[in-house]
UniProtKB/Swiss-Prot annotation:
One term under GO cellular component: cytosol
Subunit record text: Homodimer.
Protein name (database record): Formate-dependent phosphoribosylglycinamide formyltransferase
Binding residues annotated for N(1)-(5-phospho-beta-D-ribosyl)glycinamide, in chain numbering: 22-23, 82, 286, 356, 363-364
Residues the record lists as binding Mg(2+): 267, 279
Pathway annotation: Purine metabolism; IMP biosynthesis via de novo pathway; N(2)-formyl-N(1)-(5-phospho-D-ribosyl)glycinamide from N(1)-(5-phospho-D-ribosyl)glycinamide (formate route): step 1/1
Known EC number: 6.3.1.21
Family: Belongs to the PurK/PurT family.
Coiled-coil parts of chain: none
GO molecular-function term, one example from the UniProt record: phosphoribosylglycinamide formyltransferase activity
The UniProt record lists the keyword Ribonucleoprotein: no
Gene (UniProt): purT
Protein origin, superkingdom: Bacteria
Reaction catalyzed: N(1)-(5-phospho-beta-D-ribosyl)glycinamide + formate + ATP = N(2)-formyl-N(1)-(5-phospho-beta-D-ribosyl)glycinamide + ADP + phosphate + H(+)
Length: 393
């Protein structure tokens, strides 16, 4: 039997979020709907999840000692990583001491960089992937590019949102890609993965929920990337029954190997009926923001239920749905928004503004959501709604 206490009392059920961006914010909201006390942690103040949490802490999550001090003081029932850049060795230690890490400390450790999860998927589980090599020095990198061949993609083993990622098409690009990867990783310079091109038709995110009652799959999500970052997503993405079955088989294999309860975003390349594993995140996925409108239970509601050991009944899809990012570019310490009434004027549209306190360069500030009679119609509506929002810097 699951028991949930009352926030801000001795009986409280406490969740501590490591990472307080827009995805963590939605998890916090869903947890609070269920009566959970939420503590939000991030490296900067007034992060989106901090704005809705019961309390918050500002600290570098790569500082294991500082992280330990907060966790020992708060004594959360669940530690919920929402980003990759965390002192995972500390999480492994804390888990051994009796703290619960979602889904597991091992999952957080393996997925904090591309090497751990790629070796698990390709070498231990035997899942098909693109050709790849890892390199830690410039000499190893040149050897890796020669072995994989051109064109190839170079990424820091620890980065997100396309940072430090580039495509090498000619010899002239080789050193530029290395230098860019050394400045774009979350932990500074270091190891990279060199990946060969997969000739795929499209890529999907297969959201997979591991919960007390088993494993549940959301409908496949298609997405559009620009500069390595998500710009649009839609659900359901049409695909053959054979490809869908193989996608779910692979998703179940890799999430089962990682273990624990929660939602996983499994990224896959599809070529005809063939499926290739790309990456997995043991947490809500940015492309899954579309589920705020596309499903009766969003990926965030599913994550909260799974974490708490609550039932996840059959999912209901609300029909063709899409999301489109509201993007800002420039510098501001107090951004504002106009055009919201125009964005929400069409039927079956929605808007989620993330409340990010600062903009420096390009930043994802919100997402427009839409339902339609077809995926094409839903995407067009979401794009119109996003375009109507003006971010004042």
């Amino acid at each position: 039997m699951v028991t949930i206490g009352t926030p801000n009392t001795p009986s409280a059920t406490r969740i501590l979020l490591l990472g307080s961006g827009e995805l963590g914010r939605e998890v916090a909201i869903e947890a609070m709907r269920l009566g959970v006390e939420v503590i939000a942690v991030d490296r900067y103040p007034n992060a989106p999840a901090m704005q809705v949490a019961h309390r918050s802490h500002v600290v570098s999550m790569l500082d294991g000692a500082a992280l330990r001090r907060i966790i020992e003081a708060e004594r959360p029932h669940c530690i919920v990583p929402e980003i990759e850049a965390i002192a995972t060795e500390t999480l492994l230690e804390l888990e051994k001491e009796g703290f619960r890490v979602v889904p597991t400390a091992r999952a957080a450790r393996l997925t904090m960089d591309r090497e751990g999860i790629r070796r698990l998927a390709a070498e231990e589980l035997g899942l098909p992937t693109s050709p790849y090599r890892f390199a830690e020095t410039e000499a190893e990198y040149r050897e890796a590019v020669a072995a994989v061949g051109l064109p190839c993609v170079v990424k820091p083993v620890m980065s997100s949102s396309g940072k430090g990622q580039s495509t090498v098409r000619t010899e002239a690009d080789v050193m530029k890609a290395w230098e860019y990867a050394q400045t774009g990783g979350r932990a500074g310079g270091g190891k990279v993965i060199v990946e060969g091109f997969v000739d795929f038709d499209y890529e999907i995110t297969q959201l997979t929920v591991r919960h007390a009652g088993g494993t549940t799959f959301c409908d496949p999500i298609g997405h559009l990337q620009k500069d390595g970052d998500y710009r649009e997503s839609w659900q359901p993405h049409p695909m053959s029954q054979a490809a869908l079955a193989e996608s779910r088989r692979m998703a179940e294999a890799v999430t089962g190997a990682l273990g624990g309860w929660g939602i996983f975003g499994v990224e896959l390349f599809i070529k005809g009926d063939k499926v290739y594993f790309s990456e997995v995140s043991p947490r809500p996925h940015d492309t899954g923001l579309v589920t705020l409108i596309s499903q009766n239970l969003s990926e965030f509601a599913l994550h909260a239920r799974a974490i708490l050991g609550l039932p996840v009944p059959a999912l209901r899809q609300n029909g063709p749905a899409a999301s489109c990012v509201v993007l800002a570019e420039g510098d501001s310490m107090s951004p504002g928004y106009h055009g919201i009434e125009a964005a929400l004027a069409e039927p079956d549209t929605g808007l989620c503004l993330f409340g990010k306190p600062e903009v420096h360069g390009k930043r994802r500030m919100g997402v427009a959501l839409a339902l339609g009679a077809s995926i094409e119609e839903a995407r067009a509506k979401a794009r119109r709604a996003a375009a109507a929002v003006q971010v004042e810097l």
